[in-house]
A protein has these predicted regions:
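C-terminal substrate-binding subdomain of Rossmann-fold SDR/epimerase-dehydratase oxidoreductases
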Residues: 34-37, 67, 197, 217-296
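C-terminal structured domain segments across diverse proteins
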Residues: 156, 174, 190, 195, ...
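Residue-level signal for the nucleotide or nucleotide-sugar donor/cofactor binding architecture
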Residues: 70, 101, 109-112, 162, ...
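N-terminal Rossmann-like NAD(P)+-binding domain of SDR-like oxidoreductases, especially those catalyzing
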Residues: 1-195, 282
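Flexible loop/cap residues within protein kinase catalytic domains
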Residues: 200
Length: 296
């Protein structure tokens, strides 16, 4: 990706980022601010303590709106006030295990939150203020799991198993419905992006492999790994963000780029979780070790 080209494109544009206080959302907001975009964020308060958002130097450099993606009235107000040209939808309940604890909240946030956002786009179109480019960020877990050895193409059936994955499958289907029902002329270019497991600086969330490794080392205990033999498409956080920015840019410039995108490493770049933790232990040194805590 040509970073200068991306920065030149986003400079001065009105961009709405939902979920801007989260891990990906903070990094994305920081990049857009650096590019000179007029950034509005809409999100709950930072989900962790400490929080990357509080460390990122964004105070006073963007319009940070604290709100719930389930609140259609508030979200609609933000659309009307900011008139975004580009919308990057990252707001979500992103943790698989939390989706088992509270599936209703997960579906409300990940499905109805997406519907609310798309409804705001539809209403903005009626008023002549529609954004030109909208990207719904989902996950590579939206696909029906066929237990095969190769990757999934964008046209594979969507049928996530657990509440988180399934809610993201539903988010995709809601997006498809809105595209076909209200934006078939592609006056608003809408895409979805399906990225896998992300690592990188500033991630303090629970049930994330690298933060869990660091917490274990800080506590002087072995790292517990639940699925050490599962292969995952781990990627650095800046890699999918670069893809999101490029997709949003390209479809803004040419609506033929609107579609559904897998975002991840080549097959040779995918490793098992155990291999990743081995690499972490080698880098950490000082007797770092892990143990298999596979869940029944």
């Amino acid at each position: 990706m040509n970073l200068k080209e991306v920065f030149d494109f986003y400079k001065g544009k009105n961009v709405l980022v939902t979920g801007h206080t989260g891990f990906k959302g903070t990094w994305l907001s920081r990049i857009l601010v650096n590019a000179g975009a007029n950034v509005t964020g809409y999100s709950l308060n930072p989900p962790t303590d400490p929080a990357l958002f509080d460390m990122a130097g964004l105070d006073g450099k963007m319009n940070s709106v604290i709100g719930d993606i389930r609140d259609l009235v508030h979200l609609k107000q933000v659309f009307e006030e900011t008139k975004p040209e580009i919308v990057l939808h990252l707001a979500a309940q992103p943790i698989v295990r939390d989706s088992y604890k509270d599936p209703v909240y997960t579906y409300e946030t990940n499905v109805m939150g997406t519907v609310n956002l798309l409804e705001c786009v539809r209403l903005a179109q009626q008023q002549g203020n529609a954004p030109r480019s909208v990207l719904n960020v989902t996950t590579d877990k939206v696909y029906h799991n066929n237990e095969w050895a190769w990757g999934y193409r964008e046209n594979e059936p969507l049928d996530g198993f657990d509440p988180y994955s399934n809610s993201k499958s539903c988010s995709e289907l809601a997006t498809h419905s809105y595209i076909n029902s209200f934006f078939a002329d592609k006056a608003v270019a809408i895409s979805t992006a399906r990225a896998g497991n992300v690592i990188g600086g500033g991630d303090f969330a629970n049930d994330r492999i690298i933060p869990d490794c660091v917490r274990a080392m800080a506590a002087g205990r072995k790292i517990g790994v639940r699925n050490p033999y599962s292969t995952r498409p781990y990627q650095h956080v800046l890699e999918p963000l670069a893809a999101y920015l490029l997709i949003a840019q390209r479809q803004y410039e040419d609506n033929r780029y609107a579609g559904y995108y897998n975002v991840g490493p080549d097959e040779c770049g995918c490793v098992t979780t155990g291999t990743l933790v081995d690499l972490f232990c080698q880098a950490w040194g000082d007797g770092a070790a892990w143990e298999n805590r596979a869940e029944a």
